[in-house]
Amino acid sequence: MTNYLLEIGLEEIPAHLVTPSINQLAERMEAFLNENRLKFDKIIKFSTPRRLALIVEELSDSSEAIDEEVKGPSAKIAKDAEGNWSKAIQGFSRGQGATPDDLILKGDYYYAKKHVDGVKSEEILSKVGDEVIAKMTFSTYMKWGNNDFLFVRPIQWIVSLLEDEIVAFDLLDVTANRFSRGHRFLANVEIELKNANDYASKMPENFVLVDAEHRKAEISAQILALASENNWQVTLHKDLLEEVNNIVEYPTAFVGSFDPKYLSVPAEVLVTSMRDNQRYFEVYNQEGQLAPNFISVRNGNAEHIENVVLGNEKVLFARLEDAEFFWKEDQKLKIEDLVAKLAKVTFHAKIGSITEHMARTKLIAAKLADIAGLTDEEKVDVARSAEIYKFDLLTGMVGEFDELQGVMGEKYALLAGENANVAAAIREHYMPTSADGQLPETKVGSVLAAADKIDSVLSFFNVGLIPSGSNDPYALRRAVQGLIRIIEKMNWHFDLSLFIDQFEGQNHAEILEFVKARVQKLLLEKLDRYDIVEAAINSSNFDITNMMESAFVIDGHKLHEPFKPAIENVSRSINLVKKAADIAEINPALFEEDTEQALYDAVISLQNQWTYKPCEEKFRAIVHMLAPAIEAFFDNVMVMAEDLAVRDNRIALLSEVVALTSVMADFSLINTK
């Protein structure tokens, strides 16, 4: 058993590509080793902005020898009319190093038994360049030199060591060897690695912390230490910490400051300038107030750190000057003037202006406000917020810091005298901004956010701008996922198709399937029964909250004893009704058996307020009241009676059963085997 080191040295990789790149390299290496039957214990990952590296631990000296059967020609073409071996069978056996008589007939085909010897690990690993590195894919590529090879960034060097032996291969003009490189500025020299096992200890000596998790821990410790020394509070934002970790090889944290006068600008603006634009960690005093300081991390040691501090402060000064200017100038603007100008701002060339988008959103929001049971005052706030909620797009601050759209809208709205509900809705209508992002907290904001997303999705689908594959340039999947989460949180019950049907366009079915796919995705993140999820999302109305609740309720009962017979009896009813060409009106006078009347009575008793019953109550009624009546009906009644009137009447009765149960789910899609 030996250890193998692979290091790919590169020009600086963009921070957001470092982690996915090293993960992909490890996955491809694992697949490559498995395909070549080369056993190993584990793969350890290392990454910095300039290198992607792996150590494969306890690698076998050679691949496993195996005996395998290779499928050959069909028996139908194995021999000619005289019973002689055909050319096809002779060619196959020759290719396998055998004779036709050595072949085995299994079923309709001939097979050759073949012994495959193990291959030395060195020979297998010499293919890593072509079979692992060259096959990597990236969202962003570069091409260099006079070749068509594409990679995330130009390759500068490759280390390939099996213990102390070089496993040589060429990739373009780079030959794998044992020489790595140190830090670009602190140790810009070749580093000879005598053994693969020296990598983790040798690189830090040359100012490269190759272990990404160790480097991240070091950054965290340094930041927390500086905060403690200065009696500050600091949050190690996960995404920011990940980004900073992927732009440095040898981190040194430092403290910077800015003029306290800028604290008159909203904290969100200052934080955006520091965190999002400059990758600084903002700090707070012990009262939780933003301090005129920041903590940043350089890619290097503490030498001449004072110059680094001054340089960073100078860059931040320019940004804060702009922010202060926009903050003062924007307050001179009137909301109504900005709203009027939105008529000349394009939402999308095929859809129209932002003003038109806002007008449609206002109509949708009014209907949602009724559904949500908002008070008259809240409905007034919904209408007002829908009239103005995009005005901040034309402010100087949002023009400079587009991350602050909505945030600045709230602040400027409050300064202009709008009430807190309207102002909050302006900020909240963008929520959630990510798959698990924060949801609106106010009712008015929830209605506006949902309405805005509904109109966006319907508008883009209406003009044929529909996401396909991974291509979703207008973030419609995120919009729908956010819409679903808002509806679920607010516990709104309404049929989404009512909004879609009132919208012009021919893509209604596609929209429903698109939304359904997002509901399915969210449910499958929490439930493991695909069939139950499918049943729930294929209920007879498009009530998203009902879909979600139904899936969880049904899943919660799947192990209960009555579950299987109940589902089977309802499914049988569904399948019989599906086969019927027409459904007649129920005529109780045509009932011939008591079980028909009993089932009819059960249906009638449940129909009252059925739609508004909680899903748990619905399912219990189906299992304990309706299903036993269905079972007794099937046990005592021949549905397909010779008398057509009686047959149609029984189908009609079952159709009422289906109408009831399908409000919750299509139970015929649930597997009970």
Swiss-Prot record:
Family the entry assigns: Belongs to the class-II aminoacyl-tRNA synthetase family.
Pfam families: tRNA_synt_2f
Biological processes annotated in GO: glycyl-tRNA aminoacylation
EC class (word): ligase
UniProt protein name: Glycine--tRNA ligase beta subunit
The organism's place on the tree of life at top rank: Bacteria
PANTHER family recorded: GLYCINE--TRNA LIGASE, CHLOROPLASTIC_MITOCHONDRIAL 2 (PTHR30075:SF2), GLYCYL-TRNA SYNTHETASE (PTHR30075)
InterPro entries named in the record: Gly-tRNA-synth_bsu (IPR015944), Gly-tRNA-synth_heterodimer (IPR006194)
Subunit text: Tetramer of two alpha and two beta subunits.
Subcellular location: Cytoplasm
GO molecular function annotation: ATP binding; glycine-tRNA ligase activity
Record keywords: Aminoacyl-tRNA synthetase, ATP-binding, Cytoplasm, Ligase, Nucleotide-binding, Protein biosynthesis
Catalytic activity entry: tRNA(Gly) + glycine + ATP = glycyl-tRNA(Gly) + AMP + diphosphate
GO cellular component: cytosol
EC number: 6.1.1.14
